[in-house]
Amino acid sequence: MENIREVVERLPLLTDPHTEFVLLRSCLSLPKIMFMLRSVNTIDHQEPLLQFDSIIRGALSAILGSPLTDDQWCQASLPTAMGGLGLRCAVDHAPVAHAVSLIAAQPLLDGLLGEDVEEFSLPQPLLDTISAQIGEDTTVETLTGVSQKKAFRSKLFTGQHLTNSRGGGQ
């Protein structure tokens, strides 16, 4: 986390807010830790994700020259197609990223192990967390192909941003 903080703190050296923002969004925010989010179940490790999101929020505040309210941060973390700045929050995406990664890897694991699991299941705490985020029951079937499902992404963002459950004030 300290490495990320150090790099983000160097963004102002560029002296071009647009370049700083593009680097923040495209390289230093969620893309920086997406591999970890896909491969590690972070349900019991929310603090580092909150810390990461706080670093990104602080960097955006520095670029804009003003601290962000919780509502402004929620809007900034929406996808650009939904009127946001595309600075996705790690704490929001971690459970779904991990679940979808497990589902995508299952056929490969079955082939490598010579097994054919007819009913693949995800850990119940993971499903419960995702269900709480989107406001409805979640199953392996509803998550299959989720990266292509606009409706699911909409539910994820609507459930999180309209209720402003994340807060994270700074």
Where are these regions (language model features)?
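Nucleic-acid-interacting cores, centered on viral/eukaryotic replication and modification enzymes
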Residues: 1-170
